[in-house]
Amino acid sequence: LVDALQLPGAIDGELLIRRDGLVQSFNVLQQRLNRKTVTPKLLTEFPAHLRAYDLLADGDEDLRGLPFSARRERLEAFVARLNSPRVDLSPMVGFAAWDDLVAARKDPATAGAGADAAAVEGVMLKRRASAYLPGRPTGPWWKWKRDPFIIDAVLMYAQRGHGKRSSYYSDYTFGVWTRGEAGDELVPVGKAYFGFTDEELLQIDRFVRRNTTKRF
């Protein structure tokens, strides 16, 4: 991926694993992250990919003050100059009415996501006239996530978080019961480390400390 990014500039994008033309899950990406040694096999099995969302700089030119519509045009030209299969553009979602956008969010496959629909988290709304602002600006931008799937699961593991959450058990692994050859068994199905308030975090942290049965 580094070899593909040889033009001077600054891209706002997302690091992905794209295998056989399909964007893989975040769990697959985690198998490439934080590796001290990256073997040729790992590079082949987990090829890094960049999906470009915005362009902050083109060469020495700072584009952050330009409206999004102008930055998008520059981004499209920038990615075209890169001319690499390792970098692509986040598709624009056209809509004439709010109901069209609701439908696109609900079914990304019909709104340009194609085979990557299962990996889409939602839609990002940006005012066409908005400048590029640091942090998480409210008003000109809005990240509208897809509705989550809900299941009843068992909290299997809890890990301490990072930064201000380093003193709390804030990273959780959940599992569900399944019938195996040896009888019922718990199988991990996913992880979660956000989606709860600070008050709920304290409640879960206390529960974990009081009910831990094993440590790893």
Predicted regions and their residues:
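Catalytic cores of nucleic-acid ligases and guanylyltransferases
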Residues: 1-170, 175-216
